[in-house]
A protein has these predicted regions:
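Charge-dense, low-complexity intrinsically disordered segments
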Residues: 1, 16, 151
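Single conserved hydrophobic/aromatic residue that forms the stacking wall/gate
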Residues: 1-7, 11, 158-168
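Nucleotide and nucleotide-moiety/phosphate-recognizing core
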Residues: 5, 9-104, 115, 119, ...
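Charged/polar, solvent-exposed surface patches and flexible loops
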Residues: 31, 74, 144-148, 164
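Anionic group-transfer/hydrolysis microenvironments
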Residues: 62, 92-96, 131-133, 149, ...
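Phosphate-binding/catalytic loops
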Residues: 99-109, 114-160
Length: 168
């Protein structure tokens, strides 16, 4: 069993922002693998299904980013899943847009959603860091993260090949 988790923000006005890339990745995986319809559970929107005979639980927390660890904690406690089997998809400004880096464990690098998850389940889980690029000026960081994707950026997220690659 493998819970996947996408980090994002709950406000409708932030649906298409770079900060919500984790949610968009979960949506792409759900669509590509025809997982179940999202339903409210564990302080988030839960989708379940199988990918290559492996049970998948994908959740998009409906908490604020800073509290997103509560949703994953409730999910893994309920289904008795080890934290080491968790995969979290999240934005990373230190990586060029569209580039992906995966790692197991490690530090939060200042990402509030990751800090929240670390607090609730520890640091021993997989992270898939999706590059959103950096604005190069510190004062532009907040606007950059909360800006909507540009048209050419948005279309990159919904290719079936990307969903396939992210789940391997």
């Amino acid at each position: 069993r493998s819970p996947s988790r996408g980090l994002g923000d709950v406000y409708k006005r932030q649906t298409n922002t770079r900060h919500n890339i984790g949610f968009k990745i979960i949506d792409a995986i759900n669509l590509h693998f025809k997982l179940s319809k999202q339903k409210p559970k564990f302080k988030g929107l839960l989708t379940t299904g199988n990918i290559e005979e492996k049970k998948i639980y994908a959740i998009k927390p409906l908490t604020f980013m800073n509290n997103s660890g509560t949703a994953i904690k409730e999910l893994i406690d309920y289904f008795k899943i080890d934290a080491k089997d968790v995969i979290v998809f999240h934005d990373d400004m230190d990586i060029d847009f569209g580039k992906i880096k995966a790692k197991f464990g490690g530090r939060s690098a200042g990402h509030n959603g990751i800090e929240s998850i670390d607090k609730f389940i520890g640091k021993e889980y997989s992270r898939v860091r999706i590059g959103i690029g950096h604005p190069k000026q510190k004062k532009k960081v907040n606007n950059h993260v909360l800006e909507d994707f540009k048209e050419d950026e948005d279309c990159l997220l919904y290719t079936s090949d990307a969903a396939d690659d992210l789940t391997r």
